[in-house]
Amino acid sequence: MRSHSITRSTAETDIEVSVQLDGTGRYDNQTGVGFFDHMLDQLARHSLIDLSVRAKGDLHVDDHHTVEDTGIALGQALAGALGDKRGIVRYGSCLLPMDDALVRCALDLSARPYLIWNVDMPTAKIGTFDTELVREFFTALATHGGITLHIDLLHGINSHHIAEATFKSVARALRQAVETDPRKSDAIPSTKGAL
């Protein structure tokens, strides 16, 4: 079973994340940030990665530490579940529409973290959620998951739709990348022999 759990405790947050790569997209996410929970649910459902997040953060300050630290812990959990990455497809991409929004994601589970972010949100908030935190989450996820991650907004006028299409696009790309390659199930997907 390709699964992993992470517990991360700082002066700002206490976070527990569990992932099961060969799941069905089950989720149980409780961060105290409603919109963010909704996005994490989308990430699980569309990647088919079972995901459980328990986060307690300094929400009296703002949502930033909770969202960013969840990204850190989730990245670490994904990296742990992937292990040496033997047999995975490694790459994934998705062009995902949601009403007015069209988001493209391409990723490589390369152990070389990098984020290219071409997403402009038209509003500063979605309800009470700061839209700039979407980028903070994916920066943390890519950095601590060892993911080369390109996300581009091609069209969009509604911030909620843009954010949701972004999470769903990344989820669908992850779904492809973490799959076991039936033709190379015993091989590291690199000519270097390691990732």
From Swiss-Prot:
NCBIfam families: PRK00951.1-5, PRK00951.2-1, PRK00951.2-4. CDD domains: IGPD. This is Imidazoleglycerol-phosphate dehydratase. One of its GO terms (cellular component) is cytoplasm. Pathway: Amino-acid biosynthesis; L-histidine biosynthesis; L-histidine from 5-phospho-alpha-D-ribose 1-diphosphate: step 6/9. It catalyses: D-erythro-1-(imidazol-4-yl)glycerol 3-phosphate = 3-(imidazol-4-yl)-2-oxopropyl phosphate + H2O. It is an enzyme of class 4 (lyase). SUPFAM superfamilies: Ribosomal protein S5 domain 2-like. PANTHER family: IMIDAZOLEGLYCEROL-PHOSPHATE DEHYDRATASE (PTHR23133:SF2), IMIDAZOLEGLYCEROL-PHOSPHATE DEHYDRATASE HIS7 (PTHR23133). Its EC number is 4.2.1.19. InterPro entries: IGPD_sf, ImidazoleglycerolP_deHydtase, ImidazoleglycerP_deHydtase_CS, Ribosomal_Su5_D2-typ_SF. It is found in: Cytoplasm. It holds the Pfam family IGPD. Belongs to the imidazoleglycerol-phosphate dehydratase family. Keywords: Amino-acid biosynthesis, Cytoplasm, Histidine biosynthesis, Lyase. One of its GO terms (biological process) is L-histidine biosynthetic process. GO terms for molecular function: imidazoleglycerol-phosphate dehydratase activity. The keyword Hydrolase does not apply. It comes from Roseobacter denitrificans (strain ATCC 33942 / OCh 114). Its main location: cytoplasm.
